[in-house]
Amino acid sequence: MFRKLAAECFGTFWLVFGGCGSAVLAAGFPELGIGFAGVALAFGLTVLTMAFAVGHISGGHFNPAVTIGLWAGGRFPAKEVVGYVIAQVVGGIVAAALLYLIASGKTGFDAAASGFASNGYGEHSPGGYSMLSALVVELVLSAGFLLVIHGATDKFAPAGFAPIAIGLALTLIHLISIPVTNTSVNPARSTAVAIFQGGWALEQLWFFWVVPIVGGIIGGLIYRTLLEKRN
C-alpha cells in the first residue's frame, strides 16, 4: 500500500508542478507566453507521463474525483479511497509550495493578486463566467473524464494506450474550460494552489471539491451501468 500512496503523491506533485507551474511561470511570459493552449498541453502531458511512469503501481489517479469516480464505477476498493485522496492532496500542496518559492524569486510577485493558477467562478472566473456556467462545465467535463478513464482502462480496450487517451482528454478538458473556471476537475489541484492564493480561492474551494467529485461519480455510474461489457 505504501508504494501505491507514494506513486499517487508523486504523480499529483508532477501534475500540479507541471500544469500549474506552466500557468504561473510560463503562460504570460513574455507577454502571451505559452497561452491557454500551452497550459492545456502541459496538464495533459503531466498525466500522460506519470501514468506511464507509475500507473502500473497505483493505477495513476492523481485526482480525488478520479479515485472516487473509479470507486463508483466498481473499479476501486472503498477501503483505499481515503488514503489515495490524502496522498494526492499532500503531493499537490508540496508542488504548490515549491512553485510559490520559485515564483517569489521574481520582484513584484503577489500570489493573492495574480490568482496563482487558482480556480474560480463569477468575478474570479478568467472569462467572467457565472457560478452556473462553472457548475455545468465542471460537472460535464468531470463526468466525461471518468468515462474516458473507464473506457480506456477497460479490459476489452486496446492494451497500452490508456495513458495517451487520458492525457489527451485532460488536454481537451483544459482547452474547453480554462476561460470558465481555470479548469479544475481535480480537487487536489484546486486545493494546492488555493492555499497559497489565500483569499477568494479558499472561499470558493468547496465548489471545486463538490462538483468534480459529483461529476466523477456520475461518469463512473454511467459507464458501469450503461457501457461496461458484461462477460
UniProtKB/Swiss-Prot annotation:
Q: Name the source organism.
A: Escherichia coli O157:H7
Under CDD domains, the record lists:
MIP
**Assembly description:** Homotetramer.
Annotated membrane-spanning segments are: 9-29, 34-54, 82-102, 129-149, 156-176, 202-222
Question: Which PANTHER family does the record match to this protein?
Answer: AQUAPORIN TRANSPORTER (PTHR19139), MIP17260P (PTHR19139:SF199)
Q: Which residue positions does the secretion signal occupy? A: none
Give the comment on domains: Aquaporins contain two tandem repeats each containing three membrane-spanning domains and a pore-forming loop with the signature motif Asn-Pro-Ala (NPA).
What's the family?
Answer: Belongs to the MIP/aquaporin (TC 1.A.8) family.
* Alphabetical list of SUPFAM superfamilies matching this protein: Aquaporin-like
Q: Where is this site: Selectivity filter?
A: F43, H174, T183, R189
Sequence motif NPA 2, residues = 186-188
Q: Does rRNA-binding show up as a keyword for this record?
A: no
Instruction: Tell me how this protein sits in the membrane.
Output: Multi-pass membrane protein
Check the record and name the PROSITE patterns matching this protein. Answer: MIP (PS00221)
Q: Per the record, what are the reactions this protein catalyses?
A: H2O(in) = H2O(out)
Taxonomy-wise, where does this protein's organism fall, top ranks first? Bacteria, Pseudomonadati, Pseudomonadota, Gammaproteobacteria, Enterobacterales
Q: Which GO terms describe its molecular function?
A: water channel activity
Q: What is this protein called?
A: Aquaporin Z
The record places the motif (NPA 1) at: 63-65
Functional summary from the UniProt entry: Channel that permits osmotically driven movement of water in both directions. It is involved in the osmoregulation and in the maintenance of cell turgor during volume expansion in rapidly growing cells. It mediates rapid entry or exit of water in response to abrupt changes in osmolarity.
Q: Name one GO cellular component term.
A: plasma membrane
Location(s), subcellular? Cell inner membrane
